[in-house]
């Protein structure tokens, strides 16, 4: 690939090679799930791919989608996750966990965890979007109407956020 800085770089080239080696749905789905756990959401384990993670995730998603279409028949494609789980059962279990959540922080972790583990193409879109609706509704109920009235500094304190300034404020 031509070296054009951020849009084409050694990191992306390395991931293109890794992704090309994936030849089974099981391997590709597991790599996508682990990649999301390691490099996406506020709960990520690493920021090393900060400029490239969305591009890499999209390439992994493409690979999983192609392998899933080859591996599954039409019924399974529309009703099972890439791991072979019944999508409705997975969704029902996640919604039950969300409904049992006692506070907004627990609910946020459930919702984000669902996205990391099951965002399409892992879960069929029809189940995933219904899950997003149900989980998001419950999360907003737990956050309550005053969530957006809470000052930013108070939200940071509640979450244990430490602000780091890379340069001095003007």
Curated annotation (Swiss-Prot):
Pfam families: MeMO_Hyd_G. The keyword NADP applies. GO terms for biological process: methane metabolic process; one-carbon metabolic process. Responsible for the initial oxygenation of methane to methanol in methanotrophs. It also catalyzes the monohydroxylation of a variety of unactivated alkenes, alicyclic, aromatic and heterocyclic compounds. It is an enzyme of class 1 (oxidoreductase). The keyword Chloroplast does not apply. Signal peptide: none annotated. M.capsulatus has two forms of methane monooxygenase, a soluble and a membrane-bound type. The soluble type consists of four components (A to D): protein A, comprising three chains, in an alpha-2, beta-2, gamma-2 configuration, is a nonheme iron protein containing an unusual mu-hydroxo bridge structure at its active site and interacts with both oxygen and methane. GO terms for molecular function: methane monooxygenase [NAD(P)H] activity. Its EC number is 1.14.13.25. It comes from the Bacteria. Keywords: Monooxygenase, NADP, One-carbon metabolism, Oxidoreductase. The lineage of its organism: Bacteria, Pseudomonadati, Pseudomonadota, Gammaproteobacteria, Methylococcales. This is Methane monooxygenase component A gamma chain. It catalyses: methane + NADH + O2 + H(+) = methanol + NAD(+) + H2O; methane + NADPH + O2 + H(+) = methanol + NADP(+) + H2O.
